[in-house]
């Protein structure tokens, strides 16, 4: 839930390991 992945996922995909898409940004925990 913390937006620390430094990645956006406007297309719905995160490439950073351990991160999930909480549109429009990737989050971890």
Curated annotation (Swiss-Prot):
Domain of life: Eukaryota
UniProt keywords, alphabetically: Disulfide bond, Plant defense
Cystine pairs: 5-19, 9-21, 14-26
Modification comment: This is a cyclic peptide.
Gene Ontology biological process terms, A to Z: defense response
SUPFAM superfamilies assigned to the protein according to its UniProt record, in alphabetical order: Cyclotides (SSF57038)
Cyclopeptide (Gly-Asn) cross-link, chain position(s): 1-29
Domain comment in the entry: The presence of a 'disulfide through disulfide knot' structurally defines this protein as a knottin.
Main function: Probably participates in a plant defense mechanism.
Family: Belongs to the cyclotide family. Moebius subfamily.
Protein name according to UniProt: Cyclotide vinc-A
Protein source organism: Viola inconspicua
């Amino acid at each position: 839930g913390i937006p620390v992945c430094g990645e956006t996922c406007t297309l719905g995909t995160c490439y950073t390991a351990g991160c999930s898409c909480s549109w429009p940004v990737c989050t971890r925990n």
